C-alpha cells in the first residue's frame, strides 16, 4: 500500500511538519529522502529494507557509490543528492562555529569534527585553526596513514598554523577501529605538538579523537 493511501497523521512528511524531524524514526526520515518506493514496497518499507541491508543508518550514509547503488531503488542521482545534503549539514556546522568561540560550544566542535572524519577508512590527522577569539577559520587534513609521534611532523603543523595566522588550534584524528581511547603515542604526539606550537605563540586547546559514539576530548580526560 502506497504512503498516499495512509491516514494523514501517519505519513512521514505530515508527521515531520507537525511534530518536527526529531520525532521521526530513521526509516521515516529515510523514506522522506527516498520520496518513492519500488514495486511492492512503499518508501517506508524500502527504507526499512535498506537500513536492514546496511545494518543501520550510519553505514548507509557512509557507503561509497558502488555499495550505495548496488541496492534496489538507489541510483547515482540519489547518491549525489545524499552527498549534497550531508555536505550542507557540515557547512552549516562550520558557519555556526565561525560566529562564536569554540570554547563556548565544545560539543558542537566535536560533532563537526566527527562529521568530517568518521567516514575515513584510514587514520587521518587534521587541525581546526582558530582566530584570537577562538572562532573557527578553517579545517585541514595534514597527514594520512598511521598517526604516531614519528609520522606527524611538528614542523608541518607549525607551518600551516602560521600560514593561517592562527592564534590557537584543536588537533584531531580518527580511530577507524571505532575505539577512541588514546594510545601512548597519541599522548606523546600531543605533547610534542603543544611544545612546538607554543614556540610560535600558537596554543593547542584540545586533541579530539573520533571513532564510534561520542568523540573523545583529551582535555576533558585530563591528558594534556
Swiss-Prot record:
Disulfide bonds: none annotated. Zn(2+) binds at residues 173, 175, 186. GO terms for molecular function: metal ion binding; metallopeptidase activity. GO terms for biological process: proteolysis. Residues 102-224 form the MPN domain. It comes from Pseudomonas syringae pv. syringae (strain B728a). It comes from the Bacteria. The keyword Ligase does not apply. SUPFAM superfamilies: JAB1/MPN domain (SSF102712), RuvA domain 2-like (SSF47781). A motif (JAMM motif) lies at residues 173-186. The keyword Protein biosynthesis does not apply. This is UPF0758 protein Psyr_0222. InterPro entries: MPN (IPR037518), RadC_JAB (IPR025657), RuvA_2-like (IPR010994), UPF0758 (IPR001405), UPF0758_CS (IPR020891), UPF0758_N (IPR046778).
